[in-house]
Each structure stands twice: as structure tokens, then as C-alpha cells.
């Protein structure tokens, strides 16, 4: 009798396994919900790194006077002279 029973179970395993797994999962889900109790209060979402960066950039921009800009001639002086004046003998 046992060999016949095992043959039937092996043949119909997909049809037996899903309902058993479904029942075990549902019982586990409800048991966990019962043990855990009420849901905790929602926590305020923290600002993302991108949002914090944008806020910081906006704060920095508010403190600056955008009418005062550095001229392009002054900006060129910060580059290494060896690179910019290599082929210009009048600047050496």
C-alpha cells in the first residue's frame, strides 16, 4: 500500500505542494502579524542625499553676489603657465 501511496504523491506533487505551501504561508503571515501587533507610527522620511545637496547649493547661492564675477583673464592665470605658454614666446 505504501508504494502505491508514494507513487500517487510523487505523480501529483505539484498539485499537492501549492495548496500546502499557500496554507503554511497564510498561517505564518497572520501569526507574525498577531505577534507583532499594531503597525508602528510612520517615521518621517529623511531627505535624500540629492535633496540635501540641492538645499546646500541653494543656501550657498543665496549668500553670494552674482553681479561680481571674476574676469576670464584672471581665470587663465590659475592654469599652469607651462601648458598655456609653451608655444607663445611673447608670454615667456
Swiss-Prot record:
Keyword Phosphoprotein belongs to the record: no
Transmembrane feature ranges: 15-34
Coiled-coil positions: none
Record membrane topology: Single-pass membrane protein
Residues annotated as signal peptide: none
Xref: InterPro entries: UPF0767 (IPR031933)
Annotated compartments: Membrane
Keywords: Membrane, Transmembrane, Transmembrane helix
GO CC terms, sorted: membrane
Keyword Transmembrane recorded: yes
Pfam family, one: UPF0767
Protein family (similarity comment): Belongs to the SMIM12 family.
UniProt-recorded name of the protein: Small integral membrane protein 12
Native organism: Rattus norvegicus (Rat)
Gene coding for it: Smim12
